[in-house]
């Protein structure tokens, strides 16, 4: 049997892509960037390999978006921050919006949990403290309505 290094370039790229996908879900954009970086001399072959993986349902931006949204919610990120992170990873804007909308998360409750984790359950005693907490929640991706 041939070693992976001796395989034809297309099989070598597919093998590396499968290794990456076995560890975690990747967006097509992420996977393409990693494969082109690993195999710059075979960059034109990466597109067809990715198309085959998508056709075989081994790579899915939908699955990646769902898994990534769950992970970011678990880390206490709000919808704006999640949307931005998905777009940075090459997920289509409409798919990002759809995935966040389908997510059954109470953003108000999550904002409260995040604030209590950071600041405890002590109420704000000054305007400056309230502004500090609001900025923190905005940084985490919550909108003004969810912060109130």
Give each language-model segment a name.
Residues 1-148:
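An alpha-helical, amphipathic repeat domain used for nucleic-acid recognition
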